[in-house]
Amino acid sequence: MILRVKVKPNAKTVSVEQLEDKSLKISIKSPPVNGKANEELIKVLSEFLKVSKSKINIKAGKSSREKLVEIYD
């Protein structure tokens, strides 16, 4: 499964919401420095989707706020 994710780094609170276009908007506390935001994104997604972090891969957009995230079965 591939998800379109819009990430908001440096947020005050962590949240996940589904947008009208079926993508997810995820607010995270980490800054977009040295991959910290991507690490927190994977952690938040794994908790939200109840899957292991090892089953989540950022397929595209590692240095962008808009990402394609692949979830393995």
UniProtKB/Swiss-Prot annotation:
It comes from the Bacteria. One of its GO terms (cellular component) is cytoplasm. InterPro entries: DUF167, YggU-like_sf. Gene3D superfamilies: YggU-like (3.30.1200.10). Belongs to the UPF0235 family. HAMAP family: UPF0235 (MF_00634). PANTHER family: UPF0235 PROTEIN C15ORF40. This is UPF0235 protein HY04AAS1_1378.
